[in-house]
């Protein structure tokens, strides 16, 4: 598999809504709020299944109904199209 090309956080944000630059590194982040823990965990489960398919895994933190996500591509040393793909998937299922 070829190494993903770095596009950078700014380019990624121009394609997404509600995401922000993570200041410590070339990454993007978003916080999702759900009705309760079960909804948050269901979201994380669906994302985990997609992450395995893409072989691209998020950094995240969960407390009750809140899921904080950070996306970056380690092989690209920054944000790549894989992060945009994952972010769009997350946004799509978070509102479903």
Swiss-Prot record:
What residue range is the signal peptide? Answer: none
PANTHER family to which the protein is assigned, alphabetical: PTERIN-4-ALPHA-CARBINOLAMINE DEHYDRATASE
Reaction catalysed?
(4aS,6R)-4a-hydroxy-L-erythro-5,6,7,8-tetrahydrobiopterin = (6R)-L-erythro-6,7-dihydrobiopterin + H2O
**What family name appears in the similarity comment?**
Belongs to the pterin-4-alpha-carbinolamine dehydratase family.
Enzyme class, spelled out:
lyase
Task: Give a GO biological-process term.
Answer: tetrahydrobiopterin biosynthetic process
Q: What is its EC number?
A: 4.2.1.96
In terms of HAMAP family, this protein maps to: Pterin_4_alpha
State the NCBIfam families in the record.
Answer: PRK00823.1-3, PRK00823.1-5
One annotated GO molecular function is: 4-alpha-hydroxytetrahydrobiopterin dehydratase activity
| UniProt-listed Pfam families | Pterin_4a
Annotated protein name in UniProt: Putative pterin-4-alpha-carbinolamine dehydratase
């Amino acid at each position: 598999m070829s190494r993903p090309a770095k596009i950078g956080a700014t380019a990624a944000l121009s394609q997404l809504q509600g995401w922000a630059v993570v200041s410590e590194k070339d990454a993007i982040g978003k916080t999702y709020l759900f009705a309760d823990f079960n909804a948050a965990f269901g979201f994380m489960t669906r994302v985990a299944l997609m992450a395995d398919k893409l072989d691209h895994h998020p950094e995240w933190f969960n407390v009750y109904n809140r899921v904080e996500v950070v996306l970056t591509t380690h092989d690209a040393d920054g944000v790549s199209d894989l992060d945009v793909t994952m972010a769009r998937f997350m946004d799509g299922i978070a509102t479903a």
